[in-house]
Each structure stands twice: as structure tokens, then as C-alpha cells.
Swiss-Prot record:
The lineage of its organism: Bacteria, Pseudomonadati, Pseudomonadota, Gammaproteobacteria, Enterobacterales. Catalyzes the transfer of an acetyl group from acetyl-CoA to the 6'-amino group of aminoglycoside molecules conferring resistance to antibiotics containing the purpurosamine ring including amikacin, tobramycin, dibekacin and ribostamycin. Able to acetylate eukaryotic histone proteins. NCBIfam families: AAC_6p_group_E, AAC_6p_Salmo. This is Aminoglycoside N(6')-acetyltransferase type 1. InterPro entries: Acyl_CoA_acyltransferase (IPR016181), Aminoglycoside_N6-AcTrfrase (IPR024170), Bact_Acetyltransf (IPR050832), GNAT_dom (IPR000182). The keyword Acyltransferase applies.
Length: 145
């Protein structure tokens, strides 16, 4: 297995994995996101490949705005991570996170952050297993003008 930063040849593999993580996201939106990731310097995606098959991915961004729970800027932000169920518990996510962290460090980041919803306890356990620490819980509100 190896981890590669996504390029145009990985786009279809990435889209297939991403659809499993976010099935409600339309196909054309996944493709538009992929094109943006390939062109933007502050975005990256990493693909885990095993025997020519994409088995996982991690999307990341460099954020310069305030990131909850962080003390520095910029921060590398894990936007999403997914590993095929048959490849979980084998260190794939750990290697994806290491690739994201190296990328962020090369971009001047000293911290990595991520988020998940309070009810997504599986994601919380995965984050903790990957070395993240919970910093705060936030509820967002809105009011229409």
C-alpha cells in the first residue's frame, strides 16, 4: 500500500470513495470539488492505493482564519477521511493522516485540526485513535435577516 497526493489520474478513484463517505453530495459537485483541489495550492487530497485499487482518501485544506481549539495560524484542517470497510484497522487512516500532516508542515502549519458532529461517536473514536484531542464543542445558530 502507498499514499499518493491526488492528481488527475486519481480523480475517478477519489470520487468513488468520496461518494461512499458523502452519498448525498451530487456527482457533479464531487467532480467540481476534485477539480478545485487539483488547482488550489491551499487544498490537497491523498489517496491510499493497494494493488492498483483506491482504498482510502483524506481531504485537507490550509486555513488562515480562526480554527476552533487552535493557537496558531495557518492550520492544516482535515476536511474528510474515509477507508473502505475491508481495509479498516490496518493503519491506512494513520498513514493518510501522516501524509496530510507532512503536507501541512511543509505549508508552515504547526497544528492540525478537524471536526465532527456531536452525535458521530464513531468519527470521534477514529479522531482520538489518530492522535487528535477534543478541544471544544460548539453549537452553531443562525437568524435570517
Amino acid at each position: 500500500m502507498d499514499i499518493r497526493q491526488m492528481n488527475k489520474t486519481h480523480l475517478e478513484h477519489w470520487r468513488g470513495l468520496r461518494k461512499q463517505l458523502w452519498p448525498g453530495h451530487p456527482d457533479d459537485a464531487h467532480l467540481a470539488d476534485g477539480e478545485e483541489i487539483l488547482q488550489a495550492d491551499h487544498l490537497a487530497s491523498f489517496i491510499a492505493m493497494a494493488d492498483g485499487v483506491a482504498i482510502g482518501f483524506a481531504d485537507a485544506s490550509i486555513r488562515h482564519d480562526y480554527v476552533n481549539g487552535c493557537d496558531s495560524s495557518p492550520v492544516v484542517f482535515l476536511e474528510g477521511i474515509f477507508v473502505l470497510p475491508s481495509f479498516r484497522q490496518r493503519g491506512v487512516a494513520k498513514q493518510l493522516i501522516a501524509a496530510v500532516q507532512r503536507w501541512g508542515t511543509n505549508k508552515g502549519c504547526r497544528e492540525m485540526a478537524s471536526d465532527t458532529s456531536p452525535e458521530n461517536t464513531i468519527s470521534q473514536k477514529v479522531h482520538q485513535a489518530l492522535g487528535f484531542e477534543e478541544t471544544e464543542r460548539v453549537i452553531f445558530y443562525r437568524k435570517r435577516c
